[in-house]
A protein has these predicted regions:
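A conserved acidic beta->alpha catalytic loop
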Residues: 36-45, 62, 93-94
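Conserved catalytic core of nucleotide-sugar-dependent glycosyltransferases
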Residues: 78, 96-97, 101-184, 188
């Protein structure tokens, strides 16, 4: 079984598009664990469990949120996963290719699969929902003709690609349950800042000796979304917190396992 672990906040139309893209996979034995990280009432996704039977939603209430970084809700998602293979991804990343079947066939305990991720702008994102069948959009979007590197937020370009931007961050990636347990999820010392959670996770994947495989022929699409308001106002300070942790603590680690508690 494959588990897809994701965190979600105020991007309901984009997430519905992602779920629609999963419906057309040849793989049927999978689940989506989505941790709703205090979304507004009109953006909640609990009702989508009836429409998408593979979806399981865990909601965090606003009074229980003490952190800024998604490492906390991601670790909650990991703890709820039942699959022996886990896809770690953002809620807004729809599957342009059959990521599930590639994960089923190629993921093992010695590797980490990094699926290509292409960013689309706001106008293109709005057009997706107009397609009655998500495959119509997937088949019509000429991603292979757009080979320039990503150069800003909300524009068309590669977020992750083995040739054009090989960062291997978890826009959409595959890792076995065994390896994720041994890593013990994301490092929760990053909870009070923003960014660098992806850097630290990748650093420990390398430290563990997993082979990073860029799956450029298996693509995902990052749909446009606005930044969280409180992060907009305080981003410089919050990013500095985690940059300091990464530079002065993470990069001096000798062990790939983190946290003082077992995530699983």
């Amino acid at each position: 079984m494959i588990s897809i672990a994701t965190t979600y906040y105020n991007r309901r139309p984009q997430f519905i598009n992602t779920l629609r893209s999963l419906e057309i996979s040849k793989v049927k034995d999978f689940e989506v664990i989505a941790v709703d990280d205090c979304s507004d009432e009109d953006q909640k996704i609990d009702d989508l469990e009836k429409r998408f039977k593979f979806l399981k939603v865990y909601r965090i209430d606003k009074e229980d949120k003490w952190y800024h970084n998604p490492c906390i809700p991601f670790n909650i998602a990991f703890s709820l996963c039942k699959g022996d293979k886990i896809i770690v991804q953002n809620a807004e990343c729809l599957h342009h290719s059959d990521i599930l079947i590639r994960t089923e066939q190629n993921l093992n305990d010695s590797n980490y699969l990094s699926f290509a991720n292409y960013s689309i702008d706001e106008d293109t994102t709005k057009k997706i929902s107009k397609h009655e069948k998500i495959k119509e959009f997937i088949d019509s979007y000429p991603m292979n003709d757009n080979r320039f590197d990503f150069y800003g937020n909300g524009v068309n370009g590669w977020y992750n690609h083995g040739i054009y931007r090989p960062c291997a961050f978890h826009f959409c990636s595959g890792i076995t349950r065994k390896n994720l347990i041994e890593l013990n999820g994301f490092d929760e010392s990053y909870a009070n800042g923003i960014c660098y959670d992806d850097n630290e996770f990748l650093y420990r994947i390398n430290l563990k000796g997993l082979k990073i495989i860029f799956e450029d022929d298996f693509k995902t699409i990052h749909q446009y979304h606005e930044r969280v308001n409180y992060i907009k106002d305080n981003s410089t300070h919050l990013e500095a917190i985690n940059r300091n942790i990464f530079n002065n603590i993470t990069q001096r680690r000798l062990s790939y396992k983190v946290n003082n508690r077992n995530v699983f």
